[in-house]
Amino acid sequence: MNIGRAIKVTQAVVDIKFEGELPKIFNALKSKLKYKDKELVLEVSQHIGDNIVRCIAMDSTDGMSRGDEFVDTGAPISVPIGRSTLGRIFNVVGELIDECGPLKGKYNLEPIHRAPPSFTEQRIQEEVLVTGIKVIDLLAPYLKGGKIGLFGGAGVGKTVLIMELINNIAKAHKGFSVFAGVGERTREGNDLYHEMITSNVININEHEKSQAVLVYGQMNEPPGARARVALTALTMAEYFRDRENQDVLFFVDNIFRFTQAGSEISALLGRIPSAVGYQPTLATDMGAMQERIASTTSGSITSVQAIYVPADDLTDPAPATTFSHLDATTVLSRQIAEMGIYPAVDPLDSTSQSLSAEIIGEEHYNVASEVKRILQTYKSLQDIIAILGMDELSDEDKIIVDRARKIQKFLSQPFHVAEIFTGMPGKFVSLSDTVSSFKGIVEGKYDHLPEAAFYMVGNIDEAIKKAELIQAEAK
């Protein structure tokens, strides 16, 4: 047993002196004493000479003192993987924090530091991941194994969108989801857990029937936990991709806090900061995690990463480094939410690299381009409408405005996870239905239908039925 003693404690950074063999970089050290009834786990970060290793604490160092003994585990932090993790909440070191008893069933332990898939393992076929959400599938489609940035303020429906994606992936693709709460508010994490129980994404009576795993490193935890919790969650997601051949959804909220935690650690380790005070290894840290999110010959991990932009400055090194890894962006707009259109995705601001004829096909590409053109024209005409009114527009512009308003309404959709709040049954719309429905609208086939018929429906057949009901009620 290789035992070392603490010789210096500086908040989240601890120096440990070993008499025998030095532990390797990234090895986990466990305390022999318990602090607040828990073992403290440290991760070796630097060898600084004189048989001393500098470590990052994964929990609070309150109550620790010089001379306390730590045991080298001989391996990196290792966390449970397997189906038994479904429906449970873990912390950064793989301990359960949901107070629902121990893990049931088989599971293995895997280290959180792993190499990304090799070139030969990676799948180069570009395949669209159908989410069943019209606005995403039509205008900013997700690729299997892609990375999506989710931008949205408080109260615009980010959590509901995340939960609907989890629900649809589970039902349509029989896939699982892993959620990493990085620097989350504890209240938000608690709310998400209870909302998942309400919407049957998590089954607390039979955990094996759940569709998601939650891993939390909350805002009140030391930077070590916040910097590693995304890797813990990613390790659990890799199991479903590599061993169960699944298409996994991996959520990170918030990727900025992952960078922020790395910056705090870097300063405590005494590294010279780079631009705007960030760690000099910012690009390396980000790349090490993002490269593990990929499609392989076994399955795929598609990540949706919520991104906070400091002071709305997109050139800040943290969001700028993240952008270089993204394949698509989904922007939630408060203006659209205020109009009562949910999901409140901005169709003109959201982008996707897969929106090209080679990947999604000629028909889909042409329909998406025409929808964007109509919406953009409507946006540019809004000032004229506000000042002079609709009567001053040309006949052609009036038709465009009418179609744009129908498209805007048709981009709304009732969600399965919101059924209990709205009373409307949720709709999963297939990609072919989405494309053909919007094709009909832009070609003018449904110009005779009232605008209200397009609001909160699935495909165009439902809009036609709704129009018939509206006309029947009017009589």
From Swiss-Prot:
SUPFAM superfamilies with a match to the protein in the record: C-terminal domain of alpha and beta subunits of F1 ATP synthase (SSF47917), N-terminal domain of alpha and beta subunits of F1 ATP synthase (SSF50615), P-loop containing nucleoside triphosphate hydrolases (SSF52540)
GO molecular function: ATP binding; ATP hydrolysis activity; proton-transporting ATP synthase activity, rotational mechanism
Record PROSITE patterns: ATPASE_ALPHA_BETA
Compartment(s): Cell membrane
Record-linked Pfam families: ATP-synt_ab, ATP-synt_ab_N, ATP-synt_VA_C
ATP-binding among keywords: yes
This protein's GO CC annotations: plasma membrane; proton-transporting ATP synthase complex
Topology with respect to the bilayer: Peripheral membrane protein
UniProt subunit comment: F-type ATPases have 2 components, CF(1) - the catalytic core - and CF(0) - the membrane proton channel. CF(1) has five subunits: alpha(3), beta(3), gamma(1), delta(1), epsilon(1). CF(0) has three main subunits: a(1), b(2) and c(9-12). The alpha and beta chains form an alternating ring which encloses part of the gamma chain. CF(1) is attached to CF(0) by a central stalk formed by the gamma and epsilon chains, while a peripheral stalk is formed by the delta and b chains.
HAMAP family found in the cross-reference section: ATP_synth_beta_bact
Protein name in the entry: ATP synthase subunit beta
